[in-house]
Amino acid sequence: MLRWHVRHGTEVGREADRVIRAGTLMPDTTMMRLVGPELAKRRDGDWILDGFPRTDAQAERLHEFLEAEHLPLSLVVHLIVPEEVILQRILERWTHMPSGRVYNLSFNPPKRAGIDDVTGEPLEKRDDDNPETFKKRIDNFHRVTEPMINLLREAPCPLHPDSPLLVDIGGETSDIIWPKLLDVIQQRFRHLQGVKS
């Protein structure tokens, strides 16, 4: 959502671009202003929030919004990947900026180096794909997000009272993580039993 605003040069996008480049977090109120209307549009369907909430205040605002809108939260997944693996993925990441398509030199390389497979246009490195920004983000994660995750770990799931709201899934590669994630999703969302990928 933030990257869409950055690509389209909106006011929020310009703010997000500065924040992303600095490796810091968007203000809580700004994030909820973006997320709230999107969730309201999806009230009758399934939805995934990736990377939100990241702070206690965001989690509290999200909780208040979901309660007011009668939208129960079904599942929170905490992906646990070693920091050195995340850094390596970031350093090897190349992006087709207009579409957001992402390539990785180790496990999803483009057919031709530096060229998008679909359009033939050049791939780019994001300005924030560097060790310094990664370090700031990891420090923020440990300082701000990890305590919130620990609180969510204790919360029951509103729709499945016998199940935890938060589930930890760990691994180093998507071929290890994906089957675990799919299993959790299919257990929690029975209507998605046939989903393969």
Labelled PLM ranges:
Residues 1-71, 82-88, 126, 133:
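ATP-dependent small-molecule kinase phosphotransfer cores
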Residues 8-13, 113-121:
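Short, flexible, mixed-charge acidic loops at enzyme active sites
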Residues 25, 52-53, 80-81, 110, ...:
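Short, surface-exposed acidic/glycine-rich loop or hinge patches that mediate macromolecular interfaces
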Residues 47, 73-75, 164-167:
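Residue-level recognition of the N-termini of beta-strands and the immediately preceding loop/turn
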Residues 50-51, 69-93, 98-118:
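Conserved phosphate-donor/acceptor-positioning beta-strand/loop module used by diverse small-molecule
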Residues 122-197:
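NTP-dependent small-molecule kinase module
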